[in-house]
Amino acid sequence: MADYLISGGTGYVPEDGLTAQQLFANADGLTYNDFLILPGFIDFTADEVDLTSALTRKITLKTPLISSPMDTVTEADMAIAMALMGGIGFIHHNCTPEFQANEVRKVKKFEQGFITDPVVLSPSHTVGDVLEAKIRHGFSGIPITETGTMGSKLVGIVTSRDIDFLAEKDHTTLLSEVMTPRNELVVAPAGVTLKEANEILQRSKKGKLPIVNDRDELVAIIARTDLKKNRDYPLASKDSHKQLLCGAAVGTREDDKYRLDLLTQAGADVIVLDSSQGNSVYQIAMVHYIKQKYPHLQVIGGNVVTAAQAKNLIDAGVDGLRVGMGCGSICITQEVMACGRPQGTAVYKVAEYARRFGVPVIADGGIQTVGHVVKALALGASTVMMGSLLAATTEAPGEYFFSDGVRLKKYRGMGSLDAMEKSSSSQKRYFSEGDKVKIAQGVSGSIQDKGSIQKFVPYLIAGIQHGCQDIGARSLSVLRSMMYSGELKFEKRTMSAQIEGGVHGLHSYEKRLY
């Protein structure tokens, strides 16, 4: 018998791979392409993988995906789409406070349970008022009360069916002449549960269901469109009022307090303090201010890349941390400022420290593929923030343009001179608003059209689930537990290994991801 054969079965398995602790034990800075995760044992299907993960101490998402607060990535359309698919979007602040607050308001109004502050008109208003409300708010199903306010006696409702075929000369017609009167309405009594109200609405086949008290006064309304959204987007991120979750970015200067007030009034659920280097007296002071004035508001600090930076913000009271410095595709901070850290190392080091205090970590930057998302989550990140990966989608701000026959959208770093020249908010992010000479920490560019994130994000979700399946983790919490226990094994990649792991040896090929 050959001396290399083992008797007694296959109980012996040699140690293979590195634990995360061993991977990051030396002083080398590693990023996502520098290592791989070794596969585990599969005893479940990919669609069984639970992607629920914490955004902050008190907010949990069903999908660990976040859109970055950049002016070429996230405004209302992106934030709505991200929330519908289980993630969240952060509205950028390279704009006026009023514009930003209005974008948050659009997200919060997109889907609601009981709508307690709907647009209400009186019988003496005109058809023109309804059309104006439709332009401003995007809908025309408007309840009519005696005084045109909530809490007043319900007398009817105006829908698009009542006014669709009216000529322009009829825009001065009073609503009392065109509305559907109270005696033809289906209503529900105050105190009804949302589930019961939705059942009544389904049976009635109406577009809106007014909720009235025993004096027939309007107290709320629910919309049929929200029923459809519930059916079509089961993973949607919602608050306790069944409105979509929405985040917003603010700076750390004194005038940002006014912006913060408007954002909280608009209904923002979480605030991210937007700074390229978060370990500053300015950010610590702003965290203290927010926690004192708005104790219910969740605050994400950052950006940080070391445990020492994280400590100061955790001590200040942040509910989450944003990790990354100079690793974004449009960021040149490491090149210009000589500061930063490779993103793989940054995520692991900060997450390993912050978890001891129950503070979730967002991996922000350097995400180029769905594999990078899986690696970031495997290193301890609870969620992943994306900029370039979501840029040039239909929902991203900006207009498409063509160059050499390719459909493109502009994408720029918030530290680029383009962004700084648009608004001082992006200058504050890099502590340069008072400088005579602006030091760019980002570039402007363009990205090829990716289509709608309604297709792209489901691809990312499925990719994460398949990655976790190959690893042998049924959920993201299991994935992190495997990493910290040492069960999850990694391996460094040489440059040759990275080339081998990509497409190679072909004369030509087409790379279709979804």
From Swiss-Prot:
Gene3D superfamilies: Aldolase class I (3.20.20.70). The active site is at residues 331, 429. GO terms for molecular function: IMP dehydrogenase activity; metal ion binding; nucleotide binding. Belongs to the IMPDH/GMPR family. This is Inosine-5'-monophosphate dehydrogenase 1. The modification Omega-N-methylarginine is found at residues 341, 355. GO terms for cellular component: cytoplasm; nucleus. Keywords: CBS domain, Cytoplasm, GMP biosynthesis, Metal-binding, Methylation, NAD, Nucleus, Oxidoreductase, Phosphoprotein, Potassium, Purine biosynthesis, Repeat. It catalyses: IMP + NAD(+) + H2O = XMP + NADH + H(+). It holds the Pfam family CBS.
